């Protein structure tokens, strides 16, 4: 049976912050805790699943691996909480980076990884999150984000060398191969050399600013274009905007996770938009035309037929969201809610009482009411 997505288990978007994850986890853990549900096997299993999901998503390295490989990132270790994954992966000590790095180091070129023998270590991929309004998701928007990253060292022009030269020596750890082997029980595991980062050579005269790495930590401000029609949880890839690669290697990518704030008027379902509109009782009974707001900022007029009931829907074609990578558009649905008047004046009460007397003397006008009481009569007649 396929495992449930960890983000779905916790009820959060893929761009959820650490605080949002913790809040969601605490709420669900309290709800499904075995002490609160004694003898409930389903609640106990749910509690275990919630803990498993939070154990992965609260850890940046595990979360990055899960975002990339899904549940497959943990299958060989028997699960995210298994012993082989604890404390830097137990028996797999010496693997720098996260779970994703382990997969790349073990299977490297076969998986199409960027790291290979005798090449500099490519820059790490980065994650960022942005939150936008529903109206911004409709129109598309540009937003700026600040990202802590590593950039090319200005002092050595990214070469890692104090004299900006290409002078280097054969790496003493891997002998120039760029990869080293380690015995792990019955297996011999090959991984990227931790000394030279896979380049096979080390800088002869390291830069004092970056210690030969070719990169330094810095915060960057980037402009992100969010397309019209983007959905909650969408991941946008900015190629080459991740960390700079060591000593001239290719940079990583930046993945921006988009979350959308709830709107006070509109709700969204795919490309369609829904708006709940209150109607006075007389409006619903008599019919007429009403003016409603549309998500594009305009106003639309909708004809309401006489006898409209709560729950009736009216469609405005093409007034919904645009569909990504398509010319199609969704629709807007007006959902009616008929309101019962409160705090009546004396005159209003008199009119309603007169209306009720008239309604009681007529055989038509309330088909659902009449149908219900006809069924009640049949029920008692059959006793």
UniProtKB/Swiss-Prot annotation:
Its cofactor is Zn(2+). The J domain is necessary and sufficient to stimulate DnaK ATPase activity. Zinc center 1 plays an important role in the autonomous, DnaK-independent chaperone activity of DnaJ. Zinc center 2 is essential for interaction with DnaK and for DnaJ activity. GO terms for molecular function: ATP binding; heat shock protein binding; unfolded protein binding; zinc ion binding. GO terms for cellular component: cytoplasm. The gene is dnaJ. The keyword Transferase does not apply. Zn(2+) 1 binds at residues 153, 156, 207, 210. Keywords: Chaperone, Cytoplasm, DNA replication, Metal-binding, Repeat, Stress response, Zinc, Zinc-finger. Participates actively in the response to hyperosmotic and heat shock by preventing the aggregation of stress-denatured proteins and by disaggregating proteins, also in an autonomous, DnaK-independent fashion. Unfolded proteins bind initially to DnaJ; upon interaction with the DnaJ-bound protein, DnaK hydrolyzes its bound ATP, resulting in the formation of a stable complex. GrpE releases ADP from DnaK; ATP binding to DnaK triggers the release of the substrate protein, thus completing the reaction cycle. Belongs to the DnaJ family. Residues 5-70 form the J domain. GO terms for biological process: chaperone cofactor-dependent protein refolding; DNA replication; protein refolding; response to heat. Homodimer. This is Chaperone protein DnaJ.
């Amino acid at each position: 049976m396929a495992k449930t997505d960890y983000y779905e288990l916790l009820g959060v978007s893929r761009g959820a912050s650490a605080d949002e994850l913790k809040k969601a986890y605490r709420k669900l853990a309290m709800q499904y805790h075995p002490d609160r549900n004694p003898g409930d096997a389903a609640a106990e299993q749910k509690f275990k699943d919630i803990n498993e999901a939070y154990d992965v998503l609260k850890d940046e390295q595990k979360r990055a691996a899960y975002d990339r490989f899904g549940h497959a990132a943990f299958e060989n270790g028997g699960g995210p909480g298994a012993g082989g994954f604890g404390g830097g992966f137990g028996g797999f000590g010496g693997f720098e980076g996260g779970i994703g790095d382990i997969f790349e180091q073990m299977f490297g070129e076969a998986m199409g990884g960027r790291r290979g023998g005798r090449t500099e270590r490519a820059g790490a991929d980065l994650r960022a999150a942005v939150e936008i309004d529903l109206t911004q998701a409709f129109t598309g928007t540009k937003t700026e984000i600040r990202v802590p990253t590593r950039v090319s060292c200005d002092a050595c022009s990214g070469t890692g060398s104090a004299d900006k030269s290409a002078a280097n020596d054969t790496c003493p750890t891997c002998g120039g191969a760029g990869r080293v082997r380690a015995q792990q029980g019955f297996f011999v595991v090959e991984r990227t050399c931790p000394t030279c980062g896979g380049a096979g050579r080390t800088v002869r005269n390291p830069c004092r600013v970056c210690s030969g790495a070719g990169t330094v930590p810095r915060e960057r401000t980037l402009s992100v274009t969010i397309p019209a029609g983007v959905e909650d949880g969408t991941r946008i890839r900015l190629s080459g905007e991740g960390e700079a690669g060591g000593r001239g290697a290719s940079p990583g990518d930046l993945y921006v996770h988009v979350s959308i704030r709830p709107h006070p008027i509109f709700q969204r379902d795919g490309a369609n938009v829904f708006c709940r509109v209150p109607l006075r009782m007389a409006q619903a009974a008599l019919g007429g035309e009403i003016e409603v707001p549309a998500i594009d900022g305009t106003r639309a007029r909708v004809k309401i037929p006489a006898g409209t009931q709560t729950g009736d829907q009216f469609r405005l074609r093409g007034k919904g969201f645009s569909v990504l990578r398509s010319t199609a558009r969704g629709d807007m649905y007006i959902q009616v809610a008929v309101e019962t008047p409160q705090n009546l004046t004396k005159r209003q009460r008199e009119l309603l009482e007169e209306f009720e007397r008239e309604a009681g003397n007529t055989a038509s006008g309330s088909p659902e009411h009449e149908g219900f009481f006809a069924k009640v009569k049949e029920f008692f007649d059959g006793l």
